[in-house]
Design a protein with these regions (language model features):
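Helix-to-loop junctions at the C-terminal end of transmembrane segments
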Residues: 76-88, 275-288, 371
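Cytoplasmic helix-loop-helix junction between adjacent transmembrane helices
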Residues: 119-155
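Conserved MFS/SLC helix-loop-helix module at the cytosolic interface between two early adjacent transmembrane helices
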Residues: 75-110
Length: 407
């Protein structure tokens, strides 16, 4: 009797320790993505109006800086498909690089050098994102806590929220954009120090019970589903990026003299984190493709609301609808990659991230070209909304094909 009670107590203690470790991994993943994505990629968005105000760049140059970052993101995603070695080592390198490259944006006032720094920052962001996503999701699977995967993707929203609120305060105190970059480098350093020890070694080998196996599908169907998923994910990259790059600029153009434009980007960040958290509470048996299609339609609706009603209410509601599905889209896409490839999904995750990057590369220069022709962002935003709707339609067709194959 005593031995049975002791064994039960040990089992409870092990479960509690496993639960704590799972939360530590999930939160570390969130902070890691806050650095890589929220700061490394998206701190540029709220700082862009400050850079325009300082006269260090114009809108066209800002579009090219954004494109350079997305080109780097694409290159980094391709690298992830061929890089071999410890995921945690690449995560640490990516975090350290993000800190240094963000610091460089504040130290050197050279648009030509900024193009190089933003390109390298994109590479670091992609590598950190892919390796951190893969490592954390695998570790959570080992700890039998895959439902916490959505917590990881709260990180970008957290970073966007912090940088958005901080930038709003900087604007009110008439800071230069360079001070903003230096401040965000310090913030990235602090967050990196917090998670550094978590990414100290490789994930332990999966037990057979914990390993993820690809769904039993005919090879031809797996190929078609993979192609469809990568195409749809590329459309998502193009569809969101125009608004995500230029939201503060668009809002300032529509609401001149108002203080509200500084708050739409933090609202977007809150919505990103909330959406990622809500995604963890959806039933696990819901189909990822249908969830992705719903997310695409939400984002398209948010964009069109901003076009139809360029007011405080319209931009606020649009920011919420654009942000809620933002990283949920990534979570559902990465989960579908694991459905198709199981624990060998890292290369597919890299491919998805690369195609997403292609969409992002095309978006900003197209937007600035359309703005030069029309004087506003309406046409580029309508193109973005149409692209998201097309992606939702493709995902719906993929789901119908798989259902018909199972019938």
């Amino acid at each position: 009797m005593h031995e049975a009670q002791s064994a039960a107590a040990v089992g409870i203690a092990m479960k509690m320790e496993q639960h704590r470790e799972a939360w530590r991994v999930a939160l570390a993943g969130a902070l890691c993505l806050a650095v890589a994505m929220g700061i490394g990629r998206f701190a540029f968005t709220p700082l862009l109006p400050m850079m325009l105000h300082d006269g260090v760049i114009d809108l066209t140059a800002g579009g090219w800086l954004a494109t350079a970052n997305y080109l780097g993101y694409f290159i980094g995603a391709l690298l992830c498909m061929v890089l071999r070695g410890s995921a945690t080592r690449f995560i640490r390198i990516g975090l350290a690089a993000t800190v240094l490259l963000t610091l460089g944006m504040g130290l050197w006032q050279s648009p030509g050098l900024w193009l190089v720094l933003r390109t390298l920052a994109g590479i670091a962001s992609a590598c950190t994102f892919v390796f951190a996503s893969g490592w954390c999701l695998q570790r959570l699977a080992q700890l039998q806590a895959p439902a916490l995967g959505g917590i990881i993707y709260c990180g970008p929203g957290l970073g966007i929220l912090l940088t958005g609120l901080a930038t709003s305060a900087m604007v009110s105190h008439h800071w230069k954009a360079s001070y903003g970059w230096l401040s965000y480098a310090l913030l990235a350093l602090l967050l990196t120090a917090i998670v550094w020890r978590t990414f100290a070694g490789p994930a332990v080998s999966l037990t057979p019970a914990a390993a993820a196996s690809p769904q039993a599908l005919p090879p031809a169907q797996i190929v078609r589903q993979t192609r469809g998923l990568t195409t749809a994910y590329a459309l998502a990259g193009f569809g969101y990026i125009i608004t995500a790059t230029f939201l503060p600029v668009i809002a300032r153009q529509a609401l001149p003299g108002s203080s509200w434009p500084d708050l739409f980007w933090p609202l977007f960040g809150i919505s990103v984190s909330l959406g990622a958290w809500l995604a963890t509470h959806l039933p696990g048996h819901w189909d990822n493709r249908l969830l992705l299609a719903a997310c695409y339609l939400l984002q398209a609706t948010g964009i069109l609301i901003g076009v139809a009603s360029p007011s405080v209410f319209g931009f606020a509601l649009g920011s919420i609808l654009l942000g809620l599905p933002f990283t949920a889209i990534t979570l559902f896409a990465m989960r579908d990659a694991r459905r198709l490839r199981g624990d060998q999904a890292r290369s597919l995750m890299g491919l998805l991230t690369a195609t997403y990057g292609i969409g992002q590369i095309v978006g900003p220069p197209l937007a600035t070209r359309l703005v030069q022709g029309s004087g506003n962002f309406t046409s580029s935003l309508c193109v973005a909304a149409f692209t998201l709707a097309a992606g939702a339609g493709l995902l719906g067709l993929m789901y119908r094909e798989s259902r018909q194959a199972q019938a």
